[in-house]
UniProtKB/Swiss-Prot annotation:
The gene is cpx. It comes from Doryteuthis pealeii (Longfin inshore squid). It holds the Pfam family Synaphin. The modification Cysteine methyl ester is found at residue 149. Residues 150-152 form a propeptide. PANTHER family: COMPLEXIN. This is Complexin. GO terms for molecular function: syntaxin binding. Belongs to the complexin/synaphin family.
Length: 152
């Protein structure tokens, strides 16, 4: 503990002496600090990559071991449930339930059906009157055609 305090006191005095010298020390210090920061960042990134690679290898070995045990005892691999199915089980959820892909597809089909039914008349009595008038219109148009054309 005493060594730490002594270093702090001497270090502070050393910094004050450097500050009296001018900004030259600070420029070199800034360049060195930037280089050190870049080197430290690179070392951290490399360490993280090594850690991830090590973890991946260990996980592969574990999976191989699990597979040998499954084969030995005739067990089947557990299939993970989809996150959507797990989300449905959340009872304490504050927001509304998100729609599944199937529900979205069903809604799209309903909209298409609505578009097709929009072509038909909405009033059934209107449709029946048009159907009942149809034979009379056909007879009238056939009569007009026969008057215009005479068979010889």
């Amino acid at each position: 503990m005493a060594a730490f305090i002594a270093k702090q006191m001497v270090g502070d005095q050393l910094k004050s002496v450097k500050a009296m010298g001018g900004d030259e020390g600070e420029k070199e210090g800034n360049e060195n600090a930037e280089e050190e920061a870049a080197a430290i960042e690179e070392a951290r990134r490399e360490a993280e990559e090594r850690r991830k690679e090590k973890h991946r290898k260990m996980e592969e070995e574990r999976e191989e071991m699990r597979q040998t045990i499954r084969d030995k005892y005739g067990l089947k691999k557990k299939v993970k449930e989809e996150p959507e199915a797990e989300a449905d089980l959340d009872e304490g959820r504050v927001g509304r339930k998100k729609k599944t892909k199937e529900e979205l597809a069903a809604e799209a089909n309903e909209e298409e059906d609505d578009d097709e039914f929009a072509k038909f008349p909405t009033d059934l009595s209107d449709l029946t009157t048009k159907v009942s008038e149809l034979p009379q219109k056909m007879a009238a148009s056939v009569g007009e055609v026969t008057e215009k054309c005479s068979l010889q």
